[in-house]
């Protein structure tokens, strides 16, 4: 085997390893799914939410999803209360983005956020978490700022 062939074979092996490594990252482990409830003036509704509690999972969010069932969602846990802003880059479906204070009270709701938009959507206050649900669902439920979200990450939740 010539030096050229050996280098070429080594390069191809390295390229294959890199490709397989990146392919593995695209299929990261599924997020933990937990129950969450929203409490409005008209009642309580339960959701099964994926919990995004790492930087990587929060960055990925619901990007590239083609659908979201009415009883599903994603809860972004920031662990530390903070101002937050979201965008819809690479998000294919409209979402209701619900910003939630540390005590579980809803601070603000961005209704039917526009898919693929890179315009920042600010929280309008300090939040511990953000809930994303199917666009239009918050209106169906009669969900408003001041209503409550019950989940283990919120005080009293």
What positions do the PLM features span?
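Compact, glycine-rich, soluble single-domain proteins
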Residues: 29-157
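A periodicity- and composition-biased signal for non-globular, repetitive helical segments
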Residues: 13-15, 64
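N-terminal secretory signal peptides that target proteins for export/translocation
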Residues: 1-6
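N-terminal export leaders
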Residues: 8-12
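Bacterial Sec-dependent signal peptides at the C-terminal "C-region" and cleavage site
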Residues: 22-30
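Cleavable N-terminal signal peptides
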Residues: 15-16, 26
